[in-house]
């Protein structure tokens, strides 16, 4: 299977302002944006996102109903993009606080998710609720807890949400054996 890389229509070099053109740097590699004036290579890097699967002291999961697209009205665990220079684990804790109003302790890495042709790389952690009152910010319509048998599988926003929740549940069952 050949992966297709999409080059966004950037026209000018961020280093010198010269014109960018598409060029292959090495045989077999996809075309890159290269400045004709200074030679700067404009790499379209992936965007790093984090997610936090939060459980309370009774093992219920915290999910947020999205108030923004994509996935408006669908359920996700708290998450979002990592800011440049921010530690990934601190971003996961920050997103839990911002999107669900909760302070958490990260317990372990659930998995890392990426998909061909998509920019985000999603790093998902399992976490335990420590304190706070469940509350949504402007990106959420509702926040609530779900028992494992109540997860709204048909109303989850993203493939990564479904896969991470399944991986989390499978990991809990394996650990319990």
Task: Identify the meaning behind each predicted range.
Residues 12, 32, 53, 63, ...:
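Conserved hydrophobic/aromatic beta-strand scaffold that supports enzyme active sites
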Residues 2-47:
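Cys/His-rich short segments
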């Amino acid at each position: 299977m050949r992966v297709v890389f999409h080059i966004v229509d950037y026209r000018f070099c961020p280093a010198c302002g010269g014109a960018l053109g598409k060029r292959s740097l090495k045989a077999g590699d996809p075309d890159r944006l290269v400045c004709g004036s200074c030679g700067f290579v404009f790499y379209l890097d992936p965007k790093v996102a984090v997610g936090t699967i939060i459980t309370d002291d009774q093992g219920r999961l915290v999910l947020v109903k999205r108030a923004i697209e994509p996935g408006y009205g669908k359920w996700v665990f708290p998450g979002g993009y990592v800011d440049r220079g921010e530690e990934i684990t601190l971003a996961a804790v920050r997103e839990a606080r911002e999107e669900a109003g909760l302070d958490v302790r990260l317990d372990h890495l659930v998995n890392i998710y990426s998909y061909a042709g998509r920019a985000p790389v999603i790093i998902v952690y399992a976490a335990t609720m420590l304190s706070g009152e469940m509350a949504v910010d402007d990106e959420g319509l509702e926040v609530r807890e779900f028992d494992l048998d109540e997860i709204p599988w048909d109303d989850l926003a993203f493939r990564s949400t479904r896969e991470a929740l399944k991986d989390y549940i499978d990991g809990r069952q394996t650990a319990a054996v």
